[in-house]
Amino acid sequence: MKKNKWHLHRAGVLNFWYYDEEEFYFADGKLLLRGSNGSGKSVTMQSLIPVLLDGKKSPDRLDPFGSRARKMEDYLLGEKNVVAREERTGYLYLEYKREGVEQYLTTGIGLRAKRYSNLESWYFVLYDNRRIGRELFLYEPSFSMEDGKEQKIPLSRKQLENRVGNGGRVVKTQNEYLELVNKHLFGFENPDSYEELVKLLIQLRSPKLSKDFKPTVIYEILTNALPSLSDEELRPLTDTIENMDQTQQQLDQ
């Protein structure tokens, strides 16, 4: 068994949905969110996973039932008749920790939304052991003259690039982010295999899994999620079959 595996250690949000800034700690890679129906457990979890695994932010990713009713920018800006907000910048991130050692790695997404405009996003991986909210902050502190309170102004993409420096990567596209997460955390030989893993997680999280999927369908889902074998891995089997064929031919003669 491989030692020192990465475990989910902490999740964080800044300026997203009803959160100004919040952290959620995992225990041995597990997180329990408690609350009454409608308190936001599902929205919080689905805004983090699987979004932060591959960077895809389509509406069906944010709803376990696959609904496309609400977009990521809706959660960032809030409902217009409830919140008088026309633009907002926020961050989502996941922090991983090596088992048994003080080694950390963080993956995250920056989001900027304007009412009636397309969502802007950028992605980052922090791999020099700095931690969000400790050695690196996703905001710039500012003092408000109006209410006399300190404000936290989220960093722009350029500001984040300057903060991260050589201790990580800040990229502009979802595909680049997916490849970085796979490279630094999961180690699949190709991104396609990693994408299949994420698809499997999405299928298995369905609240109606036991109702809608027969055992044969679940078997098919799990089978399709298995990585394909390379020619090198198949060679011993093909060699054995060829040897068996040759032996049979010799016996027949």
Where is each model-derived feature located?
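Extreme N-terminal "head/tail" segments of very large remodeling/mechanoenzyme assemblies
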Residues: 1-160, 191-192, 200, 221, ...
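Extended, Lys/Glu-rich alpha-helical coiled-coil stalks
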Residues: 149-253
